[in-house]
Amino acid sequence: MPTWTDIKDHARSSYKLADEHDHSFKVVFEYPGNRLQAVIASHYHAMGRSWVDFSSACCRADRLDPQAALRQSFNLAVGSLCLDGDVYVVRHTVMVEHLDLADLEVSMHAVARAADQIEQSLPIYEPASDKVSDVEEERV
């Protein structure tokens, strides 16, 4: 059974960490078309157990209809699509005692790939015209 330290050490030896703290680290994956997708692994305790949460942001809440988000979440092989503030994230949580270090890479890649695919599936975002004029007025 790995510890959080084992998990961080394994991630550090396998990837260049973009960010690291006592209870979290971030890995950035690159996909075709120079797209980048960050995954944050966070460690916490709940229900008397140690957990690792993998999350990757995919879009702002206003870019995805809630029903479409639920359909997207249902179709994910790993994790779920969640609303974190005003951002949708793909999230997958595992008990540390059940995590094999080889599965660490599978979990991170699955979350990153799912978030990237959701983001890619969205139409190109065009801001509302009133928002653009507000920004232009602030610059003047």
Task: State where each predicted segment sits.
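Generic alpha-helical secondary structure
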Residues: W4, K8, D62-R63, L104
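Short, surface-exposed beta-strand-loop junctions and turns on beta-sheet-rich folds
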Residues: G33-N34, R60, V96-H98
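Short, highly charged C-terminal tails/helix-capping segments
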Residues: L122-V140
